Amino acid sequence: MTFFQPDKLPSLMVAPNGARKVKKDHPEVPLTIKETVEVAKNCFEAGAGAIHLHVRNDKGEHVLDAGLYKEALNELEHQVPKMHIQVTTEAVGKYSPEEMRKLAYDVTPPGASIGTAELIPSRNPTEEDLKLYKYLTEAGTKIQHLLYNPDDISLLVNLLNKAEILSLIHISEPTRPY
């Protein structure tokens, strides 16, 4: 499936659910794909051009499940075809770098957020890390790099130099690590 890829990334991206919040925390947090699609439609109509997407299992837990992501991407593509979709590879302390990479390969999303330090806890990019970044770049995936401190910026620069990726990168420095 070919997903919408804007020439320029939208200036407003919504992140309606994250990895941890549940209905007890906020009754409107979308946990199912159906709920997430409905929120995405409403946000798009209000002016958001992109969504940062987490999928949940039947227990409402954040999962790196390629099947659920593909289902969500398919639904979002049909319901909000002009919205840029970014999936997360967030480990949440339960997924390994190998599982993060596997999700990215299996889904090949239009956009992905990658916590650089989560993906490369050794702080030394491996051949597998380089292959992943080259693959996603060649596939046209827009990567948002989550960086929490200056060391993470150095790690990303090292990774991109080793991978010989010179294209525009998208960096986010969250105000706090999760």
Regions found by a protein language model. Give the residues of each.
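Active-site beta-loop-alpha junctions enriched in small/polar residues
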Residues: 15-19, 56-58, 88-92, 115-119, ...
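Single conserved hydrophobic/aromatic residue that forms the stacking wall/gate
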Residues: 169-178
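N-terminal small/glycine-rich loop or linker at the start of catalytic domains
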Residues: 2-28
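Conserved, mostly hydrophobic/aromatic
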Residues: 36, 43, 54, 112, ...
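Alpha-helix-loop-beta-strand connector modules within alpha/beta enzyme cores
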Residues: 62-87, 136
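Active-site mouth loops of central-metabolism enzymes
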Residues: 19-35, 88-96, 121-123
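Hydrophobic faces of well-ordered beta-strands that scaffold small-molecule active sites
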Residues: 12-14, 51-53, 83-89, 110-114, ...
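Active-site-adjacent beta->alpha loops and helix N-cap segments on the catalytic face
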Residues: 60-72, 95, 120-133, 151-155
